[in-house]
Amino acid sequence: MSKIFSIKNLKCGITSADWLPTKVNCGFTLAEGATHVNLPPTKVKCGFTLAEVLITLGIIGVVAAITIPTLIHTYYEKQTVSRLLETTSILSQAIKTSEEEYGELGSWGTPSRTPEYGELVFNNLKPFMKVANICGIVDDKEQCFANRYALLHNRGYTGYNQEKPKYKFTLLNGSAVSVQGVSSNNNLQINVDVNGVSKPNIMGKDLFLFTYDAEKRSLLPMGHPDSMYPYDTNCVAKDGTGYGCAYYVLKFKDMKYLK
């Protein structure tokens, strides 16, 4: 069955099976002499109200405030762990190779907290490392290390460049390193700031301590159970100084003690 509707010159043919909108077939004939159809403009307004926009922006702001600090912390932690692992490997390999070349570290001279001994150690290590900058004993312009570092968990500050016997330099990977003899034994004290003078300049966040045990011929991160600053009391503990964090980072590959 078919019905024909005629409205002025508009004709639509609709069969009983054509009631779905997609099946409506409409046509019209132009009046005599007409060349086009003048249809009234159709206005469609789409948009959000000011209240809706403000609510959406508020939600975005809350989500950003929650997620962005977490993302930044995660990135910083991964970068620090990776840099410390890399620098530890560089120093261990340099010491090992230099001992093969010049003899065991204990035979390089009498270990002491003197500028001369620190420079001697550096000169023996230098051929086996990619050094970017040499600051030496005096680093008043803070080209390698900052002048002052905060202790972990707001425990105050410690001077650094004022401790003159340390011989300081930076590696191509961005880490700053200082070497210093220890007069009481054949050990060597080595400190690493994984991002040089850049902040945060906090013990246990970017500054980490090591010793080289000449008898064991091993670079030991401060914080190992037998060290003078075990990591459980000098890193993980809420009142820890940060002196023992190197061992924690290298062992667990994270910095969860900051959370």
Language-model regions: role of each:
Residues G58, A64-T74, I90, Y243-K259:
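Long hydrophobic alpha-helices with heptad-repeat/coiled-coil character
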Residues H36, G109-Y117:
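Intrinsically disordered, low-complexity coil segments
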Residues S92-P111, V131-I134:
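Alpha-helix exit/C-cap motif
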Residues T70-L91, I95-S98, Y102:
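Aliphatic-rich helix starts adjacent to a transmembrane/signal segment
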Residues P115-K259:
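Intrinsically disordered, low-complexity regions enriched in Pro/Ser/Thr/Gly and acidic residues
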Residues K23, T42-K43, L71, G223, ...:
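Intrinsically disordered, low-complexity segments enriched in proline/serine/threonine
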Residues M1-F48:
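N-terminal leader/signal peptides at the extreme start of proteins
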Residues T29-A31, V44-Y76:
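N-terminal single-pass transmembrane signal-anchor helix
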